[in-house]
């Protein structure tokens, strides 16, 4: 094939379980076809043999013994909160807590977008989050404050300009790049693209997709030399022109892992993490598939870590932190190659695909115990990634957790040991640097756990979590002081519950603080496990009307529902004006808002 590459010329080619850690002796949906709760499945790989450039020492996918913490600085439709200027204005409070900040895909997508329908790669950075000048200012300001920015990289697929097969023509370093119809996989969109192309005089690649397909846009043929050339140039632009330190690769199951090896070998990012949303074996195989010289060139998100935390929090059974999720241990587990994948595990407890978006797009969220979930996340090995909504709600407490983590010297390769496990609490010890240790206890009765040794000293505690340290004095740990106006409401049964909320003797009831947009009428739907809501509340959906009993300090109306049954329900939903909560575990006297249980009246 002829390379048409010269200055100002177009460049294209035609072509059950035991604990997973050491044991102690004492709508604008992105449409990605990811399973809600993945099990292992390995996509077919028809990639021809490739010989990527040999990586240097810096091209190791993710640093060993890395003690940094990452922030995912967006959620779904966070068009206001994730503006480049808004994020830059928060630099002071992010500094010291977060070492990496992952931001949305920053190119123009041809309209309001979260970035997963990527269109322009080089020449148009007026996105839904700001313009190119604001983006560069954000990255440079972060860099000046020792915060590195992670780019969201979407190269599995690409949006078209005006028809099914045309792409933008863009110039970078005096070279013009343009993808063509033969850069689209032969079996794109189940054959619909090929049918359209044939009818309109175009040809697609002769190669089928090397991974899973996605019908939303054109899946790129990464065997195409033109695609590889343009992707390499794109990554060079992100890293060496815009100033990103690393990449978060979207939907990496859509193409062979060997291409990530090629691209990272060429671009040499300091950090690389792939979204391989699947079971642990598939994630591990993907990491292995990025190897060059037997060295992985990328980390991956530890989805199974997230699912174990979800299982424990949502089911109020903290033993599940020490159990497999549908036969999958987390990557950080000792049962996954003796813990050898911890270096390449980016852990998290919520992201934009799992969060609660709306009543009609509830996803698979954490329903309660956000603080306990983050306390566990920030105590464990792997590189923790905190979700923006969680940071916004609990900045001071999360910042304190990170401060303890860093003071103890916990890294992505630290060794955890299970110290206690029962339904009410789970305790894990993690060894940091210089034999300093952190003991994290989470669960509904976390405060009732007493460490076996008096050498443990409590350093911080909150709603359903306690941190103890050993080998370092609590007074030696400096906690950040966020501006008072930015302090979040504490997630505690004693904070934020109005005094007019009371529970009578033997009364089965719950309280709901409703957002003003939910209207003046709130209904309650409750049910027993295996039972029917209509049977329990005595009426059809949307249930029985709750009584408005007062106004909270923030102006929201507070409603009370009292059961007429002798037995408490297992689950509850509040709804109003077309909005509704997720299915929530019923707690007698529980004080809820749209995010879940905030506390218990009288406790």
Q: Which residue ranges define each predicted feature?
A:
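Boundary/entry segment of secreted carbohydrate-active catalytic domains
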Residues: 52-83, 213-224, 509-513, 518-523, ...
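Active-site-proximal helices and loops of the catalytic beta/alpha 8
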Residues: 51-76, 86-95, 105-119, 136-147, ...
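Substrate-binding cleft of carbohydrate-active enzyme catalytic domains
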Residues: 130-163, 169-172
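Structured interaction patches on ligand/partner-binding surfaces of diverse proteins
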Residues: 578-603
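Aromatic- and acidic-residue-enriched segments that line the glycan-binding/catalytic groove
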Residues: 112-122, 157-203, 265-266
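Aromatic-rich carbohydrate-binding modules that target alpha-glucans
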Residues: 515-566, 578-584
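Glycine-rich phosphate-binding "P-loop"
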Residues: 197-231, 236
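Bacterial Sec-dependent N-terminal signal peptides
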Residues: 7-60, 492
